């Protein structure tokens, strides 16, 4: 058991019978010096998010989830199938992937971390950066441009993001999977 004041982003807590991952915490002190902790939480079983407030001394159960490095194998509607080093396969529901599904493509070589709760694969964490091919973007706009010029692009997997003006269709780019931002040309 930990107090609300000891919980950090990335911890998983049990709340109302469900596991919630802490995405953000903010501690403030009231006039009477009692700490109030505001947390942004994401339900690992239902992919819902909420913001809630706790007193600093409130106790909550901090749980440890099993994580396993896996590679993406294939998609069997509505499940994404991942395989570990011993060739064991784990099914993760498409709804549990959220935005990560747009970065999962056939033949991807990056290792993902599959998270388990009570023996069931419930979510997938992508690497911090992935390299993907630009499948469509408009030609560069030459002329009256100064500074950092961005344009929309679609990548393999279907995600749309802003890329630098010099990126062309067919280029490989590096993307930050946490912020969904273009980092550089690969």
Swiss-Prot record:
Pfam families found in the cross-reference section: EFP, EFP_N, Elong-fact-P_C
Identification of the protein by name: Elongation factor P
Organism encoding this protein: Shewanella loihica (strain ATCC BAA-1088 / PV-4)
GO CC annotations on file: cytoplasm
NCBIfam families cross-referenced by the UniProt entry: efp, PRK00529.1
GO terms of molecular function: translation elongation factor activity
Pathways involved: Protein biosynthesis; polypeptide chain elongation
Cellular localisation: Cytoplasm
Similarity comment text for this entry: Belongs to the elongation factor P family.
HAMAP family named among the record's database cross-references: EF_P (MF_00141)
Described purpose of this protein according to its UniProt entry: Involved in peptide bond synthesis. Stimulates efficient translation and peptide-bond synthesis on native or reconstituted 70S ribosomes in vitro. Probably functions indirectly by altering the affinity of the ribosome for aminoacyl-tRNA, thus increasing their reactivity as acceptors for peptidyl transferase.
Keyword vocabulary terms for this entry: Cytoplasm, Elongation factor, Protein biosynthesis
GO biological process, one term: peptide biosynthetic process
SMART domains: EFP, Elong-fact-P_C
Protein's UniProt keywords contain Phosphoprotein: no
